[in-house]
Structure formats: C-alpha cells, structure tokens
Swiss-Prot record:
Keywords: ATP-binding, Glutamine amidotransferase, GMP biosynthesis, Ligase, Nucleotide-binding, Purine biosynthesis. CDD domains: GATase1_GMP_Synthase, GMP_synthase_C. InterPro entries: Class_I_gatase-like, GATASE, GMP_synth_C, GMP_synth_GATase, GMP_synthase, GMPS_ATP_PPase_dom, NAD/GMP_synthase, Rossmann-like_a/b/a_fold. HAMAP family: GMP_synthase. NCBIfam families: guaA_Cterm, guaA_Nterm, PRK00074.1. One of its GO terms (molecular function) is GMP synthase activity. This is GMP synthase [glutamine-hydrolyzing]. Homodimer. It comes from Porphyromonas gingivalis (strain ATCC BAA-308 / W83). It is an enzyme of class 6 (ligase). The gene is guaA. The active site is at C79, H167, E169. ATP binds at S220, G221, G222, V223, D224, S225, S226. Its EC number is 6.3.5.2. Residues 193-381 form the GMPS ATP-PPase domain.
C-alpha cells in the first residue's frame, strides 16, 4: 500500500507549497479541505495542518475538532494550524500589535528535539501572521522562539504533535525543507516515492483498473497528455486510441506537427478537424467561464462521437494534473475558474474518465516523461491550455481573431527560440485583447487590435513571476507583429505575477 502524508487545507495561499516541499523529499502527499479528512486512513503516516487567512477567533474561521486527531498520527500545525492546537487546548492566542511579516531568526530552545534535528540556531524563517501565541496550555513546551515570537515552535509532551508559527514551506525559511524532512522521519516515511516508482505503480494500477477495456485519449500536444499517452500505451498497448482535435484554436501549424510527433512514438492517433463546430458554438459568447464550458463540452462531444465510430470504447483519458484540480475549487467551495479538464463537462458522459497524472505537479510530470524516455522537445514544451487560444482571445471568439492571434503568437514563439530565451521561460504566449486603439501606418490612420505578451517563470503553476525579458527582444517582437500581422497596431507586455493574477487571462 502506498504510504502518504495528508495536508489539511484551512485556506492558506501556501498550502500547495507545503505539498511541493513534501513531494521534493520523495514522499507522496495529498491535499484535502480541512473538513474532508478521509475516513480510511490506512497508509496515512502523518498529518499537516496548513495556515489560514482567518484568526482562530473569527466567526467564519475554518474549524475542526483537533483533539480527535491528536495522538493518533504524528501532527504538525503550521501558523494557523499551530494556533488552533493551542487555542483548542486552552492556551492564549492574541492579536499582534502589528502584523508579523517577513524574515526573522529562530533561536533553538531544545535543539535535540526530533523536529529540529540538524537545524542551526539563528536560522532564518519566514513569518506571516496577525495573531501570536502568548501562552501555551499545560503539556505544551517551547522548542524554539524568535525575538518577537517567543513561542515560535512547540511540541506536546507525550504526543507526536508539533506546531510552528513560521512557514517552513516558504523558500525564505532557509532550513524549512530540513524541518519538514524531520517531520517525515518522525512519521516513519521511507522517502522512496520517485518517478520510477510512480511509473511502476501507475502502470500496474492502470492494467488492473482497465483490464482489456479500450480507451480513447484526448491529446493536446502538450507534455501532460503526451505523458499520459505513453503511460497508457505502456499499460494497455493497442487498446489505446488517441484523439487529437483541431478546434481552430491551436497554435499555428500545431495540428500537423503534433500528429507527426505522436506517429514517431508509435501511438495510434486519429486527427479530427472540428473547427466549424467550435466556432459555431462560441459565436457571440463573451463570458470567460461560459467559453471554457463550451470548449470543454465540445471536446467531450467530439470524443463521444469518435468513440461511437470505434468498438467497445469505455474510457476517456485526460491529462489532468494536480494544479488543475486544486484551482477548480477553492476551500470554501467557491469556483475560481473551471479547468478545461475538470470543469465544463456535461453531466452525462458515455465514457468513464481515467486521469493517471491527476495527483502530479507539472515538474513531476516532466520528470516522469524523461524517465519514460520521451523526446526532450515534447517534455520541455511550454504548458499550453486545453482550450488553447480560446482563453487567450478575450471577448467573442471568431475565426478571424484566431488567425490574428495564431500569427502574432507564432512570431513571439519563433523569436523566443531564435534569441535563446525559450528554455529560460516556463510559459509564454500572446493574448488578443478586446481593445482597439488608434495608430498610424504610413500616412493612414488605423484602428486595430492590441496584443499582450505574457511570459512567466514557475515551478508548478501555483505561483508565477513575470519574466524580465530584454527590451531589445520585446522591441523586436512588437515591431515584427505590428508589421506582419494584419489587424494589430499595438503590443503591450504583461508584468503581473501570480498571485494575485492568474497565468492565463481567462
């Protein structure tokens, strides 16, 4: 049985960073909403309680009865999680005079404590809280503190329960990963979850789950669906039929290039031209969420139609990855934006879903692909959304706009490769804005579209920083697009990071 750690999410923006750090330590973990702890805890070796935007005293704060968890499994509370342990046990948590945010130095009071093994006294940690623990309940003891936060870390005597008021998952906490590793050792984790072990377990699981059933797989040309294709092919061979849909919103020349790539992989691929269907369905639609749902529904309908042409197809494969799942539903149940792989699907489907990468982050998918021996140019391609340029054309989608954006995007990507910037950027693309502006070309006044350029660096799509591309490069791209793409007379560069912005505009 796969051993794992569970992270209970109380709404923190850094919950997924906790998961990333744990995965980096070759340990499998899963994130669950704070009130959705699985009843079956077999295989679970420990639990981490995340931070939260709330105070323990807020009426809307996310609460569970922590006494029911204490003593059963090793427990680590981070920030709000630590404060909740103290508050529920009768200790004092009070507002800070001013919010404590940023770097500080941690003094170890009990350096021999199992959670602090190997840490240096004075190590830098990252604080981010508005409340602080001022008094610990009986049975709780301080193991580390800072100048302003004397109870920065504690443990409960006689239990494998700890709390820290700083954030070990944040990069600025110098030895945060070491602390999390110590907790994994306390939990008795083997730390043997690797790409090779994932492939072995997943292929075995797919064979058991699918048996002799036939599967069709949604191909996009991106790394996610490519890795899924190779995994499924390894598990069930010719029982896999890959479906690649041209919805008219792919990058320029993408349809032909992708078909060629997959033929080289020995996959059974059917190419479907469904441009007219998608453009007709999207006509007049401007709402981003509605567009996503239409595109998602269109995909499933096309797959359903293709499945009927084939015999005995029972499963639909998809390249859903963990950030897709996490982004689709917030902790409160409020939709952030539906993802094309996990939202926008019709209620009735004639096929069951199989999503082998559902619990992997993007960088983990790439490592799995390399372990599978896939071609580097497939593995290191920039992420490209399933709805394609459909979520990069703001406002109504038309075939004319799609052509404009394809041409602009092609210039941007080609120059990025030419300048040696492509592999330095995690994701890049052009966006067609629903904004026309006045320009002058030759002696004539123009009134044409604006294109925005986007380029970000990221590890896992949960957070992203905009890339400081050279001005000379941006000037070259702008000049080429304006001169060569009919319908565009202005180019701008997006300098927004995630959060608060998302990577895609819609």
């Amino acid at each position: 049985m796969l051993e794992k750690l569970i992270i209970l999410d109380f709404g923190s923006q850094t919950t997924q960073l906790i998961a990333r750090r744990i995965r980096e330590l070759n340990t499998y973990c899963e994130v669950y909403p704070y009130n959705k702890l699985p009843e079956d805890l077999s295989g679970v070796r420990g639990i981490i309680l995340s931070g939260s935007p709330y105070s323990v005293y807020d009426s809307k704060a996310f609460r569970i009865e922590l006494s029911e968890l204490r003593g059963k499994l090793p427990l680590l509370g981070i920030c709000y999680g630590a404060q909740s342990l103290v508050h529920q046990a009768g200790g004092k948590v009070e507002p800070c005079d001013s919010r404590e945010y940023g770097r500080t130095h941690l003094t170890l009071r009990q350096p021999d404590d199992a959670l602090l093994t190997g840490l240096q006294s004075g190590t830098t940690v990252w604080m981010s809280h508005g409340d602080t623990i001022t008094s610990l309940p009986e049975g709780f003891e301080v193991i580390a503190g800072t100048e302003d936060v004397p109870n920065a870390a504690f443990r409960i005597r006689g239990e494998k329960t700890w709390g820290v008021q700083f954030h070990p998952e944040i990069y600025h906490s110098e030895e945060g990963t070491k602390l999390l590793g110590n907790f994994l050792d306390i939990c008795g984790m083997k730390r043997d979850w690797t790409p090779a072990s994932f492939i072995e377990a997943t292929v075995q699981e797919l064979r058991e789950r699918l048996g002799d059933d036939k599967v069709i797989l949604a191909l996009s040309g991106g790394v996610d669906s490519s890795v899924v294709a190779v995994l499924l092919n390894k598990a069930i061979g010719r029982n896999l039929t890959c479906i690649f849909v041209d919805h008219g919103l792919l990058r320029k020349g993408e349809f032909e290039r992708v078909l060629q790539d997959y033929e080289h992989l020995g996959l059974n691929v059917i190419g479907v031209n469904a441009k007219e269907k998608f453009f007709a369905a999207l006509s007049g639609v401007t709402d981003p969420e509605q567009k996503r749902k239409i595109i998602g529904r269109g995909f499933i309908e096309v797959f359903d139609e293709e499945a009927r042409k084939l015999k005995d197809i029972k499963w639909l494969g998809q390249g859903t990855i963990y950030p897709d799942v996490i982004e689709s539903l917030s902790i409160t149940g409020m939709v952030i934006k539906s993802h094309h792989n996990v939202g926008g699907l019709p209620e009735r489907m004639n096929l069951r879903l199989v999503e082998p990468l559902r619990m992997l982050f993007k960088d983990e998918v790439r490592r799995v692909g390399l372990e599978l021996g896939m071609m580097p140019h497939l593995i290191h391609r920039h992420p490209f959304p399933g709805p394609g340029l459909g979520i990069r054309i703001l406002g109504e989608i038309t075939e004319e706009k799609a052509t404009i954006l394809q041409n602009a995007d092609d210039i941007y990507m080609s120059l990025m490769r030419e300048w040696g910037l492509y592999d330095q950027v995690w994701q890049a693309g052009a966006i067609l804005l629903p904004v026309r502006s006045v320009g002058v070309m030759g002696d004539e006044r123009t009134y044409e579209y604006t294109v925005a350029l986007r380029a970000v660096t990221s590890m896992d799509a949960m957070s992203a920083d905009w890339v400081h591309l050279p001005y000379d490069f941006l000037a070259k791209v702008s000049n080429e697009i304006i001169n060569k793409v009919r319908g565009v007379n202005r180019v701008v560069y997006d300098i927004s990071s995630k959060p608060p912005s998302t990577i895609e505009w819609e």
